[in-house]
Amino acid sequence: MNHSMLRVPGVASLALALLFSAPLSAQETQLSDPEIASVAVAANQVDIDYARLAQNKSKNQDILEFARTMAKDHQGVIDQAVALVTKLNVTPKDNAVSQKLKADADKTRKSLNAKSGKAFDKAYIDNEVAYHQAVVSVVEGTLIPQSQNAELKALLQQVLPVLKTHLDHAVMVQGKIGG
């Protein structure tokens, strides 16, 4: 049995706090489509920022490859979301869920930035596993069900399998580096 998930380091703890707090906040508050767009863009930007940090700090090829994929894929989702909200003439609206997401990410980035070498690699990939678990949960359980616009809902449904693939990739890398 893999006991590493039982000993959650500080960085992953923050991501797990997001897992349990952001989805609950989103479920308790009906989000409008502009608010959903804001959460989606924020969630993708957060992971791009994590990836850039990993690209600057890690020397591990598995981590670097994973980070490149995250930066590229999540930027692609942001580009699609921006194109959609532009087409729909909708402005993403900041809200409690997107604000909490960004605040938690700032804390996580600071914690990650304080680490180096193998400790950084482990903390980064542990965070990525927890973060993608949280994002999959929010997209699946909150954002898709609450989306009113068919095109926004379709975009979220299209992105969900990619997020699940990211989670699987993160778990694989975590196993390779001893996460």
Model-derived features with residue positions:
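His/Met- and acidic-residue-enriched segments that coordinate or traffic transition-metal cofactors
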Residues: 2-12, 18-179
